[in-house]
Amino acid sequence: MILISDATLRDGNHAIRHQLSAAQIHAYARAADEAGIDIVEVGHGNGLGGSSCLLGQTPIGDRLMLETARAALRTSRLGVHFIPGLGKAADIALALEIGVDVVRVATHCTEANVSARFIEQTRVAGRTAFGVLMMSHMAPSDVLLAQAKLMERYGAQAVVLMDSAGYSTPSLVRAKVERLVDGLDIDVGFHAHNNLGLAVANSLVALEAGARIVDACVKGFGAGAGNTQLETLVAAMEREGHDTRTTFEHVMALARGTEAFLNPKTPHIQPANIASGLYGLFSGYVPHIQKAAQEFGVNEFELYKRLAERKLVAGQEDIIIEEASRLARERDVQRATDGVRISELSA
């Protein structure tokens, strides 16, 4: 049976600048539970401890978000996203105290070593720990396998490849998922973004390659061009004969029901989202890049290229400002140089 992890109340928070209310969390968690969703992930878009001036502040804290969801769930498991450095061991302790069932410890795809203490902390408490390798397009299959093996050794019960930038094509997904499935003794999962319009296709390919866990959001509600759309994914999975706890009818009822209290809009793939996917930049960076380009008066797509050259990972918003400022200075120097040349030619 394929396990579906619903990130609507976590990754979806990116789409509305992390402003989900307690009432929305409770209503969606209850509806997802009734729809037979396996895991309902809740929190700031960047996970436990993510609320900040830099990343965006939530109107309610982690405790209230998790307590609200916990009270709404009966059969679905409650999950959280945790990035070491943004969150602390105390944040996991709080989540475990409240009754979180699944802690997804996420690191950059080449930094799995920093996940050890947090995976161990979760397992010691008797809860489920998943390892998550973010920005997975930035490492080849052999490197990803080596990193996933570290997480497995630390006690992770599954490893999820996260295509954080929506960069991957089906051939890349197949090669990487197959490598992990062949090399690990634990389940493999896949988390897609739709920047290139491939989220559902990539998720299906991941399942064909042996993945047992897929992430999705109702109506694709998520960062950038959105995540894998839950309803579309379940429909395609039914067509392909994949067994799940939910059904297309249940997730369609879930999607329709959310219009009354959440009303998530299925994201459209804008040129900025395509650029983010093409250049391999974290999907949540799009509004920050657009804002910086406007403030500094520089070309938005040139800024994408510059940031791609810097190989940005999640949590480096300050470098967006740095590169936009550098582009503006270079532009001003070029204009001054061109002005001198024109004056010399006119003399």
Curated annotation (Swiss-Prot):
Catalytic activity, EC: 4.1.3.39
Alphabetized UniProt keyword annotations: Aromatic hydrocarbons catabolism, Lyase, Manganese, Metal-binding
The protein's name in its UniProt record: 4-hydroxy-2-oxovalerate aldolase
Residues that, per the record, bind Mn(2+): D11, H191, H193
Residues reported in the UniProt entry to bind substrate: R10, D11, S164, H191
Catalyses which reaction(s): (S)-4-hydroxy-2-oxopentanoate = acetaldehyde + pyruvate
CDD domains: DRE_TIM_HOA
Family to which the UniProt record says this protein belongs: Belongs to the 4-hydroxy-2-oxovalerate aldolase family.
Coiled coil spans: none
Manganese as UniProt keyword: yes
Site for Transition state stabilizer, residues: R10
Active site: H14
NCBIfam families: 4OH_2_O_val_ald (TIGR03217), PRK08195.1 (NF006049)
Occurrences of domain Pyruvate carboxyltransferase (ranges): 2-252
A GO biological process held by the record: catabolic process
UniProt superkingdom: Bacteria
Gene Ontology molecular-function annotations: 2-isopropylmalate synthase activity; 4-hydroxy-2-oxovalerate aldolase activity; manganese ion binding
